[in-house]
Structures are given as C-alpha cells and as structure tokens.
C-alpha cells in the first residue's frame, strides 16, 4: 500500500505542469473580443471556434487546449484564426502550449496510431494567392462559412505569433482532397511569426500552406498520416530548420509542392525559399508503399538548399510536366525558378541509380512525358553540389518511444561540410552544415517527440547562432537616449574595421524602456540598416530565441516577448554602415545600441 501511494505521488510530481490545471473550460462560442486563455485552465473545444472581429486570442505558456471528438469529420473541432484576427500563442522551451485530443491525458496514454481525434489549428490571413479571385475557402471548413475565407493583397499581413507549440492527434478527412491538417495556413502574411512547432500523429499533413508569404523556423512534422509539408496556391514564404520523420507504416510525401489551380498559369507562382531540412521517411524497406520523397506539381517553383532526404520506400524526387497546360513545374525549372542544391540524397527503396531515385517527369493532366529527364539533369549537374546515394550518417533514426531518435549528424557525417551559406537577409540564420541540425538538438525539451520519449536525452542547445569564433561580446557603439518626433528620422553610423566579417546585434528600444519608468517611449520603432544607399536589412517587431540569447550574452537588458522593439542580427564585412530609426504613427523616447558579437 505504501509503495502504491508513493508511486502515485511520484507520478504526479513528474507530470507536466499542464496536468495540474484545476478547471476545464468548455469553449462553445467564437472569440470576438481580446481574450486570454490561462495555464490554470484546460480549454475544451466543443466545435469549430473562430477568433474573429479583429480580436486577439492570447494563450499563456503551458496552457492545454483539447478538441472534443466528433462522429462526422465535417464537424471536427478546430481553432480557426479568421482574417483580421490574431493568435498570440507564445509558449516557451520549458512550458510549451499543447493542442491535443480530449482523451489525451498528457501521460503518453495515446499511441502514435491514434490520429484524427480532432481537427487542428487554422490560421487565415490577407496575403496574396494565385487563385482567379485572389481569395479562397480553406479546406475542411464549409464553403458557406464566411469566416473560412482567406487571401487578399497584403503580403506583410500579421496574424500574430505561434511559438513553442505542440499539435497532437489532429486531422480530419472531410472528403477526398478536403482535409484539416495539423496546422493549416491560408494567405498568412510575412508579418506573422511561426517557429518551434511540432505536429505529431496527425491524420493528414503536418503543415499545409495555401498561398501566403509567412516565414517559419524550427518546424517538426512527426509520424503523420500524409505529407510532412504541403503547399498550394502560390506560397512564397521562407523556411529554415524543418524536420520531418515518418511512421513505419504511415506517411506519404516528405513534401508535396503544388503551385496553382487550373488554369495553371495563375500568379504569383509558388516560389518559397528553404534552407536546412532533414526529412526521414518510413524506411527504405518499410511496408509503407506510399513513402515518397519530394513531388513538384502544377506551376510550383521553389529553392531548396542544405537538405537531407533519406530513408523513403520509393523515389527521391518527381517533377511533373503537363504539356496540356501553359505552365508546369518543368517550366519553372527551365526558368531558374526551381532548384535543389547542396543536399544529401540517402537511401531509397526505388533503387540506387539516378533514374530510379529521380523519376522522369510525369504527365498527369494530359499529354506525354518529355523524352528528357529534367529531374536527373538538374540534380546531378555539378553546380548544384548535391551528394547522391550518400548515407547522411545521422546519429539515430527511430519511430518508437525508445529515445533512439537523434537526427543530428554523427562524427564523420557528410552533412558537416558542403553547405550553401543562406542569404544575409535578416531572416535566415548563418549555417555551415546540411540538414536541420548541427551538434545542437533544438527539438529537445519542448516538442511532442521529446515529451513522449522518442527523442534522445542528449543535451539541448540552440543552433540559431551566428557562425563566429569565441564566445564573448562587447558593446561596440551606443547612442544616448534620444527623442524622436512623430515624423522624425534618426541616423546613426558605425564602422567595422579589420579584414574579417563581424556579427553585430543592433537594437532600437522603445517599449523596452517602460520597465525603467521612462514615460513617452517610442511605441513602435522601425530599424533599417544601410551600406551606402543600399538598404540591406530592416526590422519592425523583434522575435526569436537568437535575439534573447545574444542580448543576454551581451549583458544588456532583456526585451519583453511580443514588444514592438526593433532588433537586427547581421554578419557584416568590414566597412561603414548607417542605421535609420523611425516611428510608426507617433513620437517618443528611444535608445539605439550596436553590439559586436565576438
């Protein structure tokens, strides 16, 4: 009896903090005003809940949101962020936000095979699509529901922040080719922040983008039924550090890339830019006959670099041609709008030759396939610097809860060299390796695969660091506090000497001054960086763990998550640079700082 009681106490103490919530709040009505969901409650979605009327739904770190099961997939429960509304879901590395099924006790009681127990999360925005009308009705929601409409003309649209989030056991097959995914994004703009998300054991795709320009980092698609990542209708966002792993018996494409609907000459073309992906299939010898690599269809383009694609039952890459259409992916390749480079192609059940791994373009909408295998010609071309039929030597691939999953490259892995340097554009992190992971395991701790015992217990660290030597920082330049008029512009200059590039942290702090009792701070500073007359970077509202870490290392004061302070991290060659600070719609106090990271 004493042993039983002690075991119960230990189990409670070891449980996630979210299990200690005392109240269950059943959500039956749409969110039409600014609302906060707290970690002291568990929220149970009774139906599809729409955040609408321009409202912001804030979800505290550690909060659990559950979806009630429905007999008919048409009625699947979901959280939908409508156009004009925002989600402010900012978990942390130690207290992620969890979306899951009602029956999930967060104790591991549900298995990987229990998929589709509720709908999922849908975010809709006003960014552009390539449909004829420039709008769409998102899959999985009745076309008669106006709150399911997405699209518009604002590529910078902001639907909020979605960070450190797990989405478990989601997905609903409403009809053929009509599904709710783990995370569905329709027309979401690049003003939105999406990073550190794990979609686990879903009944359809992990992620699907319908048009839009949203950028994303640190995405995990784990053991889902269909594709890891899927885009349609002219998606043009950027992505880095994407990881996908298939179940031994489930999973379709590593990535399914569609461009537009008929006619397939709709613009803008789908042309996302992706760096540092690790995509593992069901196993080259698995029984899952649907396990495929990449497929490019319709008029999609896209640039993919520093990718590891490995362990799929069938082919590595297939590129569609449609001679009956004015545009197709083969034409995007010929135009230079589609590229795969500096990537490792590992083991595939289709075979070891290039013609087996990279299948000939196939005609799916009429006409005959061309005589030339464009796919092989492109991927094997020397300028692409791809490594073909090469074992990436990952530390561990596992599809069971044995803590054997370790997607980091092992000693001697070819992924440790041969990478392409990402653009220095303010979004991409500087990397010198192929794949989503270096020696650091950024998935550890916050993700579902970590919480449920798939992932190794190896120490976690943050790979989102500039590739620089040493570990110290110094304040390189600091302006005095200044007052900016409503229409004022502040210019500050600095010079980097020497012969080597340097990484700098630049801050325009307005809202961050509130904690020091400074009244009248600049509410929304905008920071731009120039070399000569050339603008090379800009930032409005900062985000990202990299900034948090480098600010701490520099010894400066931390910024509140979600504040509208502006921050840039750039690796710059020696020379002179100018910064410009302006304010959006107001005047106020602001501090300008430049730190050199050494």
Regions found by a protein language model. Name each.
Residues 1-4:
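Positively charged n-region of N-terminal signal peptides that target proteins for export
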Residues 7-17:
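Bacterial N-terminal signal peptides
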Residues 467-598:
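A sequence-level detector for low-complexity, Ser/Thr- and acidic-rich stretches
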């Amino acid at each position: 009896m004493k042993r039983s009681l002690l075991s119960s106490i230990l189990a409670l103490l070891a449980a996630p903090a979210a299990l200690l919530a005392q109240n269950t709040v059943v959500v039956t009505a749409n969110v039409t005003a600014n609302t906060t969901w707290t970690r002291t409650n568990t929220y149970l979605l009774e139906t599809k809940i729409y955040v609408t009327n321009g409202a912001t739904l804030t979800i505290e770190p550690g909060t659990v949101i559950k979806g009630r099961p429905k007999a008919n997939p048409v009625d699947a429960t979901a959280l939908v962020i409508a156009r004009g509304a925002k989600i402010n879901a900012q978990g942390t590395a130690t207290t992620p936000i969890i979306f899951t099924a009602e029956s999930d006790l967060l104790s591991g009681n549900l298995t990987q095979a229990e998929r589709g127990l509720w709908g999922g999360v849908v975010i809709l925005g006003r960014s552009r699509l390539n449909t004829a009308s420039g709008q769409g009705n998102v899959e999985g929601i009745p076309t008669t529901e106006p709150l399911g409409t997405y699209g518009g003309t604002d590529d910078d649209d902001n639907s909020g922040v979605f960070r450190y989030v797990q989405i478990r056991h989601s997905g609903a097959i409403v009809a053929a080719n009509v599904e709710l995914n783990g995370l569905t994004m329709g027309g979401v703009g690049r003003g939105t922040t999406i990073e550190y998300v794990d979609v686990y054991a879903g009944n359809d795709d992990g992620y699907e983008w319908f048009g839009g320009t949203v950028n994303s980092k640190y995405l995990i698609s784990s053991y889902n039924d269909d594709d890891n990542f899927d885009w349609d209708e002219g998606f043009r966002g950027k992505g880095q550090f994407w990881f996908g792993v298939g179940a031994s018996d489930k999973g379709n494409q590593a990535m399914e890339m569609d461009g537009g609907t008929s006619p397939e000459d709709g613009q803008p073309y789908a042309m996302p830019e992706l760096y540092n992906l690790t995509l593992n299939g069901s196993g080259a010898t698995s029984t899952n006959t649907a396990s495929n690599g990449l497929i490019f269809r319709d008029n999609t383009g896209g640039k993919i670099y520093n990718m590891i694609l490995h362990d799929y039952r069938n082919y590595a890459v297939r590129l569609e041609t449609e001679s009956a259409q004015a545009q197709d992916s083969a034409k995007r390749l010929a135009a230079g709008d589609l590229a795969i480079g500096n990537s490792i192609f590992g083991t595939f059940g289709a075979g070891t030759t290039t013609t087996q791994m990279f299948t000939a373009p196939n005609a799916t909408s009429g006409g005959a396939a061309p005589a030339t295998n464009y796919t092989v010609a492109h991927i094997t071309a020397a300028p692409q610097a791809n490594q073909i039929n090469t074992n990436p030597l990952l530390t561990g691939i596992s599809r069971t809860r044995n803590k054997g999953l370790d997607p980091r490259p092992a000693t001697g892995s070819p992924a440790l060299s041969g990478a392409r340097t990402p653009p220095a554009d303010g979004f991409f992190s500087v990397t010198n390796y192929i794949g989503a992971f270096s020696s650091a395991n950024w998935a550890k701790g916050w993700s579902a695969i970590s919480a449920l015992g798939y992932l190794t217990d190896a120490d976690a660290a943050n790979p989102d660091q500039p590739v620089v030597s040493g570990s110290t920082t110094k304040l390189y330049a600091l302006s005095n506090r200044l007052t900016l008029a409503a229409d004022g512009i502040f210019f500050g200059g600095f010079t980097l000497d020497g012969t080597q590039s340097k990484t700098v942290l630049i801050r325009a702090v307005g809202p961050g001054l509130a904690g020091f009792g400074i009244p009248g701070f600049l509410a929304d500073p905008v920071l731009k960086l120039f070399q000569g007359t050339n603008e090379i970077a800009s930032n409005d509202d900062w985000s990202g763990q990299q900034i948090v870490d480098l600010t701490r290392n520099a010894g400066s004061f931390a910024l509140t998550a979600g504040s509208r302070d502006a921050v840039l991290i750039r690796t710059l060659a020696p020379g002179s640079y100018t910064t410009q600070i302006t304010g959006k719609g107001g005047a106020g106090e602001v501090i300008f700082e430049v730190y050199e990271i050494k």
